[in-house]
A protein has these predicted regions:
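Metalloprotease/metallohydrolase-associated module, dominated by Zn2+-dependent proteases
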Residues: 60-96, 112-152
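Metzincin-family zinc-dependent endopeptidase catalytic domain
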Residues: 1-102
Length: 152
């Protein structure tokens, strides 16, 4: 459920993933700029990272325990002025801006960059690639098969 707007500075977002109430911290999506967030310098339009936990899950078949990383919270930072420029000046601006958000959201849940320029997870991006490619979808599918972590 969305919690609404916050004035919390991105630099002060805590690495703590559980609050006093035992709930996982919400994902923070920040519209910011390179002055406030230096990691958005040059042509970096966004970045994201998930807060990862290691959980142990027993195998349903042989009882062995596997250690798995799961993502429970995190942050997405988007360069508002650069996104506005994409929207205003690119013929395919809306699709390109949405592609940036998709790319960063995929990082949030655990996807990494790939070398294939036809995939949305390529770090260089392309005005021609505005949706997840087959490799992106395979990665998301694999992540979706992982274990869930309870609230408390």
């Amino acid at each position: 459920e969305p919690l609404g707007r916050t004035d919390t500075a991105l630099s002060t977002v805590s690495e703590t993933v559980k609050g006093a109430d035992g709930r996982w911290s919400p994902v923070v999506i920040a519209w910011t700029n390179p002055t406030a967030e230096p990691r958005l310098a040059d042509d970096v339009v966004g970045f994201a990272g998930g807060t990862r936990l290691e959980v142990q899950t027993p195998s349903a078949t042989d009882g062995t325990v596997q250690q798995t990383d799961v993502y429970v919270s995190g942050v997405i930072a988007l360069d508002g002025p650069q996104i506005a420029g994409i929207l205003d000046y690119s013929p395919n601006g809306r699709a390109e801006a949405v592609a940036v958000v998709k790319h960063e959201a995929a990082h949030l849940v655990g996807l990494d960059h790939v070398d294939d320029p036809s995939e949305i997870m390529n770090p260089r991006g392309s005005a021609l690639v505005t949706d997840f490619g087959p490799g992106d979808l395979r990665g998301l599918n694999q992540l979706g098969r992982g274990p869930c972590v309870p609230e408390a």
